[in-house]
Amino acid sequence: MAAKFGFGVLRNDRPDLGLSHTIALGTQALADCGAILYMVADQPLLAAETVSRVAAAWQETPACIVAAAHCGKRGNPCIFPREFFPELLVLTGDTGGSAVIKRHPDRLRTVEVPAAELADVDTPAALASLQEHQ
């Protein structure tokens, strides 16, 4: 399905190495890009408009890391400019981009979004709970 829309597929054959390995695979594959937008697949209420707003904020401030947030709580999607790729490539274990953001708080720009859009759903029970509260 991804190919139908012009997207490539990158498979992580070592998920046991943690989130950092997934980030490194994507970063290596897109190393020639000016920035990378990282997203997770378990935010069912994330709106396409939010992704567009995060991208627009990065276009306005391309030297900044841009992340969706609600009341100061950061989440995904998040865009990292190329200059941060080396730091993303050396993350280990289940460490994500937050480790890079913590080292560069002055370079972070957030886009305020509804809390529900940042909801991370990892289990059927979590999905049922989220649907219950909608």
Model-predicted segments: where are they?
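Conserved beta-strand positions that form and line the central face of beta-propeller blades
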Residues: 9, 87, 120
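Short histidine/acidic/glycine/proline-rich micro-motifs that form metal-
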Residues: 44-45, 84-86, 116-117
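Conserved nucleotide-sugar donor-binding
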Residues: 75-86, 124
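Short aromatic/basic micro-patch
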Residues: 45, 79, 120-121
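Nucleotide and nucleotide-moiety/phosphate-recognizing core
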Residues: 1-74, 104-114
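A general structural signal for well-ordered alpha-helical segments in protein cores
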Residues: 20-23, 51, 85, 94-98, ...
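A conserved catalytic-core signature of glycosyltransferases
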Residues: 73-75, 80, 96, 116
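Conserved alpha/beta core of the MobA/IspD/sugar-nucleotide pyrophosphorylase nucleotidyltransferase superfamily
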Residues: 90-134
